[in-house]
């Protein structure tokens, strides 16, 4: 699993956005069995075209492309189905990308003023495989755990991975 949406609250916006951009730009994309490669291709030509189409539509809906992973061929695999990490900033919460499971190396950033607003953004999706929060506040962690509508909720972890013995459907 990988997060497809990140929501910052308040002053965390700038430092988080900068850190994510740096991380995305440092990833080595290529053939998965080559030494040092951290990310391989998407599964098919159709998948690549679908993901690139969703990225394009998101910009029409107001998102800014912070890191663009499209049209970056991998040496020796120019016809491969590679999309480098892509980060979209200020994603429209009512846009298609905010409500679609993209299944590609794309992170959509949204920004909220309050925890309540962030939880509302989390709950605005039909799908909710996971939702995670990073906080030093026990009260905020409990509020998020109780109010976020997701199959798996994580506190201070990057991916709330499902356990085989828990029901898991991906729906809110």
State each model region's role:
Residues 28, 55, 78-172:
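Conserved C-terminal structural/oligomerization subdomain of aldehyde/semialdehyde dehydrogenase
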Residues 1-5, 21-53, 68-82, 99-104, ...:
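Flexible, acidic loop-helix segments that line cofactor/substrate-binding pockets
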Residues 7, 66-69, 133-134:
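Short beta-strand segments
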Residues 5-12, 87, 172:
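Short beta-strand and adjoining strand-loop segment in the mid-core
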Residues 10-13, 47, 114, 138:
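Helix N-cap motif at beta-to-alpha junctions
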Residues 11-39, 53-71, 90-97, 147-156:
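Glycine/threonine-rich helix-loop capping motifs at alpha-helix boundaries
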């Amino acid at each position: 699993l990988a997060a497809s949406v990140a929501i910052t609250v308040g002053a965390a916006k700038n430092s988080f956005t900068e850190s994510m951009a740096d991380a995305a730009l440092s990833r080595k994309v290529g053939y998965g069995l080559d030494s040092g490669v951290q990310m391989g291709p998407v599964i098919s030509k159709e998948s690549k075209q679908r993901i690139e189409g969703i990225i394009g539509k998101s910009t029409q809906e107001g998102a800014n492309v912070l890191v663009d992973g499209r049209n970056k061929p991998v040496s020796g695999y120019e016809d491969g189905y590679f999309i480098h990490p892509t980060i979209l900033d200020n994603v429209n919460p009512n846009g298609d990308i905010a409500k679609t499971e993209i299944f590609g190396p794309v992170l959509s950033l949204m920004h909220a003023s309050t925890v309540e607003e962030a939880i509302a953004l989390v709950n605005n999706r039909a799908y909710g495989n996971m939702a995670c929060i990073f906080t030093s506040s026990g009260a905020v962690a409990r509020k998020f755990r109780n109010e976020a509508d997701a199959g798996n909720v994580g506190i201070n972890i990057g991916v709330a991975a499902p356990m085989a013995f828990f029901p898991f459907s991906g729906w809110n």
